[in-house]
Amino acid sequence: MPHRSRLAILLIDLPPHLHDRGQQFWSGATGHPVEPDGIDDHWSSLGSFADGFHLEVQRTGEGTPPRWHVDIETDDVHAEVTRLEALGAVRMADMGGFWQMKDPAGLLFCVVGIQTGEEFERHATTWP
């Protein structure tokens, strides 16, 4: 059965001691104001860019290095994980509803359910 997915979100992962400074830097660099998540203070958004690509900031735990990772959003997490494994990705952790994976070069990314609503509908690729 076909499913859809798209590269949707670039996340800036920052440990607590770097979070506020990094968040303010990227707000200034992009010209987008920080939009705090009203429910979870580990998350904030710097809005969306070309084709609805989102830039988010995530407060990670102590000991996590500052890094970037991308989220691939999909309407079928299992099918997308299976498709990406066939391309050489490796499952790292079942995060309960989404998967943390590594690409063949060892870069971390996540496969998540739909996060961007209408932007997903406009920009997702349909896979057989």
Where in the sequence are the language-model features?
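Short Asp/Glu-rich motifs
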Residues: 46, 103-104, 121, 125
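Vicinal oxygen chelate
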Residues: 16, 49, 65, 70-108
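Conserved short beta-strand elements that form part of the metal-binding/catalytic scaffold
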Residues: 30-66, 108-116
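Residue-level "edge-of-site" marker
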Residues: 39-40, 97-98, 119
